[in-house]
């Protein structure tokens, strides 16, 4: 009996030694393979040009700022740029291939062919009804017109900021604005907005709620109207709903992938609604040239500096989506 027990113990010890030997052999073989593989990589590394996709981001809580790829000089290699211009520019240039010429010039600034899109619009009013800002970066050219300063200012306020909007049922409800960021935005072929402020008894202040002719006109036959009234006061509204849509909107902050370039004019338009603050000129720029070729040449020269004050975003803006944050 004791002989059998000794034999069992001896067999177990021999097996343990054998397994330990196998494990050490496998470990030495793996070490040999790994070290040989690393040696090959080290020897070949100087001769291989690879793409480094690493990005050093500052800890700011924001991913909106564009950063240059560490192994390429084309900062905006994978970005798209939309350039919006009045149709009169194309009419003056009178060259069917002028956009191709500009595309080649943008290529010299690091923008590959096909990454820059040119979109014309008839006038400020028509562009206000259907703004379409789909590119990573959007630059809107507005030719200064002294008679359209307010229209230009409202359009700039719309496209340079993000708005969270909800429908308004003016036939059933009264509405009030809560703070300076709260505005009523109307869009359509013809928007006439009338308001009647109400007291705590819902009686009109300086107007009669049953007589729309006594309401105050705050917008008349406009295609885009941003209405600001006294905060904290209920209002009854009258809107030309057959040709216009009105929304209750809250300004969330800047739409940082859009810039407006004013062509001509003595000063950059101020789109700040609050009269006690300094004029808002961020991403509002001005170019003073008489000829459109000179305007576009200047934009090509400064395109990368212009884009540096913007931030690449994935959200787009169009005539329907502007009502909601997209």
UniProtKB/Swiss-Prot annotation:
User: Superkingdom, according to UniProt?
Assistant: Viruses
Provide the record's note on post-translational modification: N-glycosylated. The N-terminus is blocked possibly by pyroglutamic acid.
For this UniProt entry, the molecular function terms from Gene Ontology, in alphabetical order, are: metal ion binding
Localization in the cell: Virion; Host endoplasmic reticulum lumen
Detail which positions bind Ca(2+) 2: 177, 228-229, 231, 301
**Amino-acid positions noted as binding Ca(2+) 1 in the UniProt annotation, renumbered to this chain:** 95, 206, 214, 216
Q: Where is this region: LVD motif?
A: 237-239
Which InterPro entries does the annotation name?
A: VP7 (IPR001963), VP7_1 (IPR042207), VP7_2 (IPR042210)
Q: Where is this region: CNP motif?
A: 165-167
Cystine links in this protein are: 82-135, 165-249, 191-244, 196-207
What the record says about family reads: Belongs to the rotavirus VP7 family.
Misc = Some rotavirus strains are neuraminidase-sensitive and require sialic acid to attach to the cell surface. Some rotavirus strains are integrin-dependent. Some rotavirus strains depend on ganglioside for their entry into the host cell. Hsp70 also seems to be involved in the entry of some strains.
List the protein's name: Outer capsid glycoprotein VP7
